Amino acid sequence: MVIAKGAGSVTTVAERVKPESVYSRFVAFREGLGVEVLPASGGTSSAFAVLAQRLQAGKLACLVCDRDVTGGGMEVEFFGEKARMMGGPAALAVQTGAALMPVILWFEGDHWGAHVHAEIPVPAEGDSKQQAAAMMQQVARLFEAGIRAHPQDWHMLQCVFAADLDPARLAAAESAAGTGRSEGGS
């Protein structure tokens, strides 16, 4: 997912995995490529607020959003089932006016293939949460098409579909995120 409001350096968010040494290696690798990495949790400031600042300064944000890592993701229909995806990309587009442009990646032998989709515009109707939810539903549809075209390249090692989620674990994640069953997320 690319959210753009101009050109410049790239910022992303990384899930804070355990042990910390593994997270540090992921961050060091990405930073070695010139990517600014914000922690999804445990940072000195909100990743969402920093991303909004970067976008307003004309920089790029590249965000993975095909799974809910916080418990506060948005519910979408995905392959005919309810699923939860991170809503931050759409919420950032609504708040900052940055372009929301889904990207599909796949392998072609030893090389990458990529399709950068056209901007998903902010809907004229609804409040900011409704607008972001409608945009994330469009993202889900584009992801479905990309996964159908390249199913071998969707590397999902966690439950995505609501029916597959452990209710107790989901409730704990939602409680930790302070969201309940929110429509928001970042």
Predicted features and spans:
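Conserved nucleotide-cofactor-binding alpha/beta core module
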Residues: 1-59
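Non-catalytic C-terminal accessory region of glycerolipid acyltransferases
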Residues: 6-7, 32-33, 45-186
